[in-house]
Amino acid sequence: MSAETTASGYIQHHLQNLTFGQLPNGSWGFAHSAAEAKEMGFWAFHVDTLGWSVALGVIFILLFRMAAKKATSGVPGALQNFVEVMVGFVDGSVKDSFHGRSPVIAPLALTIFVWVFLMNAIDLVPVDWIPQLAMLISGDQHIPFRAVSTTDPNATLGMALSVFALIIFYSIKVKGIGGFIGELTLHPFGSKNILVQALLIPVNFLLEFVTLVAKPISLALRLFGNMYAGELVFILIAVMFGSGLLWLSGMGVVLQWAWAVFHILIITLQAFIFMMLTIVYLSMAHEENH
């Protein structure tokens, strides 16, 4: 790209989000550097992350709505086949892993799997195409733009916190506030002696609280870390491809395609893991005796 003159600048530009927030002069606008984005503080928005995640969510809804409207008992079309396979796969996963009763879990699991998969799949688009399109549309040759929402920890943590909120909600709904507090304070260590049990409460609470909080953090960081690393590999291959070394230029296309083929497994696996852990965590929240 013309906006970057060095490999370091190229990498930094591709790893920076399109950030909107309050500028140092008090006005609101887009940041044009990582330092400027940092100065915007907590209330800055990653416009590219929000835009792509919402757009892909809408695409998911429209595709499945279209398939539902055109569903037939006769010979199904390609879209209906795809949707039926997805629904059957997710439904089987929920039946195998979720041991409670809730009409919400299967639709939630389906939404998570397909939505995360679509966001991950954008990583297969060549790294320069979408940023260059953003430059052409905006007319700004220095504007940063990241299309893979799951390489932004804000997106993955936001989804994980939503799952965490459901865990807390169902834990209290199924077990009651007393049961939920008891789960945090009376396990894993217990004693028939009331005094000893009282002394164990702080230890139990510390262990269970850390375990509880670790669920959304690990859920978010696992998805973010794997997708960020995959995106970085694509960027590094692009840097080598454009380095001017002829022997590397010949290998660039091969490396890109080889990593893309392998990355198909990664993007699918990460969507599956996020979905399965969500199902397992919510199943644990529905269990009376944890």
From Swiss-Prot:
Protein's name according to its UniProt entry: ATP synthase subunit a
Annotated signal peptide: none
Presence of the UniProt keyword Magnesium in the record: no
Mode of membrane association: Multi-pass membrane protein
Record's subcellular location: Cell inner membrane
SUPFAM superfamilies linked to this entry: F1F0 ATP synthase subunit A
Gene3D superfamilies: ATP synthase, F0 complex, subunit A
GO BP annotations, alphabetical order: proton motive force-driven plasma membrane ATP synthesis
This protein's UniProt keywords: ATP synthesis, Cell inner membrane, Cell membrane, CF(0), Hydrogen ion transport, Ion transport, Membrane, Transmembrane, Transmembrane helix, Transport
GO cellular component, one term: plasma membrane
Domain of life: Bacteria
Coiled coil: none
Assembly with partners or alone: F-type ATPases have 2 components, CF(1) - the catalytic core - and CF(0) - the membrane proton channel. CF(1) has five subunits: alpha(3), beta(3), gamma(1), delta(1), epsilon(1). CF(0) has three main subunits: a(1), b(2) and c(9-12). The alpha and beta chains form an alternating ring which encloses part of the gamma chain. CF(1) is attached to CF(0) by a central stalk formed by the gamma and epsilon chains, while a peripheral stalk is formed by the delta and b chains.
GO-annotated molecular function: proton-transporting ATP synthase activity, rotational mechanism
Source organism phylogeny: Bacteria, Pseudomonadati, Pseudomonadota, Gammaproteobacteria, Pseudomonadales
Database matches in InterPro entries: ATP_syn_F0_a_bact/chloroplast, ATP_synth_F0_asu, ATP_synth_F0_asu_AS, F0_ATP_A_sf
Function (record text): Key component of the proton channel; it plays a direct role in the translocation of protons across the membrane.
Family under the similarity heading: Belongs to the ATPase A chain family.
Species, as recorded: Pseudomonas fluorescens (strain ATCC BAA-477 / NRRL B-23932 / Pf-5)
Main subcellular location: membrane
